[in-house]
Amino acid sequence: MVLMVELPPQPLRVFYLQAEIQYHYLRERMQQIALPAAVIAAARDTFIATPKLKILLDAEGVARVAEAIRAAFPEARPDVIVIDPIRNIFDGGPEGGGENDNAAMMFFLQQRVEQLRDAVAPEAGIILAHHTRKLTKKQVSEDPFQALSGASALRGFYTSGLIMHRPDEEMSVRKLEIELRNGPALPAKL
């Protein structure tokens, strides 16, 4: 499945802040992808993945992660910052709202995620991995992006959203739904 039509002129510098998978399992999963040797060689200098972090992306967490990003890429800013998953580092702000609270989600996106990007690489793209709420298959088929926790705030924030789900629990096939805020609709991909 091809998602990008154009390839960047050089490998993108990616900082992958992950707070879910232990290092050895993450390494095993990466090895299972079986990337070409040239891609692996390029990634040695351009792809930094953290071990499973136990950090809250509050004001102190933003400062600590910004410092880690600068240390990982001392010569140039990252092109992409990945946060995976939102749930494990979520800070809903002074009201203490959860990720299903749209005001708390907007606080997190504006006061934590955007501040992190602005501190290290204002032009960087952001990829946020997020869990979905429990919905029926019918609800997901009608509007898959309502499955996002904090959906209204998230959908107002991103320029493109992807949801991967299994339309039939009896089969291993996954469906990728694509939502663009500033472009023509794209068909779902299997």
Give short role names for the model-derived ranges:
Residues 7-9, 168-169:
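Short, glycine-/polar-rich solvent-exposed loops and beta-turns at beta-strand/coil boundaries
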